[in-house]
Structures are given as structure tokens and as C-alpha cells.
């Protein structure tokens, strides 16, 4: 099931979706091809799982950003809508959504956020034919267990 805010902020859509069986997080999150993340509801499905498992989502603060690769702005928009639908009170995003993993970890701790979502596939090449990743850090600024 995925919850996301619609164009009308008072309306929330709930979709029952079959799980994506290849969404098994690795060391720091989910890393797949950009094309996989472009499948309908693929990103939303993983982010839904994140919001259902991170403690303190309702009323909490989330840090969000990434390395600026292909797909980052779309992902940021999706995650922002879902964050609103899940009742987060604040999402901290830098200009253009550009945020390194160490900077995200620091912001999470300094702003006492519930965690952060970092959009990066690290050293893997980006682009439409490259890779995309969603890392999840907890309130301590470090990776959440997979």
C-alpha cells in the first residue's frame, strides 16, 4: 500500500500494490538501475516501507537530498508528497536537493531529525542507463539496518 498526497492537499490516495520482490536493501539502502526506479510505483513502494519503519514519522523532521544524479528531482518531489501524507512536520532540503551523505548525517544529528533519505548510488555511474539509489539513515545519522 502506498500513500501519497494529491494535487489537492486535503485528498490522499491509497493504492494497494503487489510488492516488488527485488526490493531487498543492501548495506545502506536500495541500489538499482535508473530504469527500475522509473517503473510505476517502484520508488513509492520503497519509500512507503521506509516511512512505515522509521520511528517518529508523525510530526517528525526528515533530512532529504542527494548527489544530483538523473532522477533526483523526481524522487525528491515524490518523497515530499509522501512525507506530507505521512504527517511529517518538516523536511530539510538543501538548494537543488544537493546533499552529500556525510553532510546529511551531520544535519540529521544537529537538527534532531528522525533520519534522512539520501538519493545516491555512490560510486556507480548515473544517468538514464546508469544506477540510482535510496539510502536511509536513522536518527543517529548512520545507515539503518537492512
Task: State where each predicted segment sits.
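An N-terminal, well-structured beta->alpha segment
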Residues: 1-86
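Short, intrinsically disordered, charge-balanced linker/junction segments flanking boundaries
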Residues: 143-146
Amino acid at each position: 500500500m502506498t500513500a501519497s498526497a494529491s494535487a489537492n492537499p486535503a485528498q490522499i490516495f491509497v493504492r494497494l500494490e503487489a510488492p516488488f520482490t527485488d526490493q531487498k536493501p543492501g548495506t545502506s539502502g536500495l541500489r538499482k538501475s535508473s530504469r527500475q526506479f522509473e517503473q510505476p510505483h517502484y520508488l513509492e513502494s520503497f519509500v512507503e516501507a521506509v516511512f512505515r519503519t522509521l520511528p517518529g514519522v508523525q510530526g517528525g523532521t526528515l533530512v532529504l537530498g542527494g548527489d544530483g544524479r538523473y532522477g533526483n528531482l523526481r524522487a525528491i518531489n515524490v518523497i515530499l508528497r509522501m512525507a506530507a501524507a505521512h504527517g511529517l512536520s518538516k523536511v530539510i532540503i538543501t538548494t537543488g536537493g544537493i546533499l552529500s551523505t556525510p553532510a546529511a548525517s551531520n544535519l540529521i544529528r544537529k537538527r534532531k531529525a528522525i533520519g534522512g533519505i539520501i538519493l545516491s548510488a555512490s560510486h556507480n555511474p548515473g544517468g538514464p542507463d546508469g544506477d540510482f539509489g535510496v539510502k536511509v539513515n536513522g536518527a543517529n545519522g548512520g545507515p539503518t539496518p537492512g
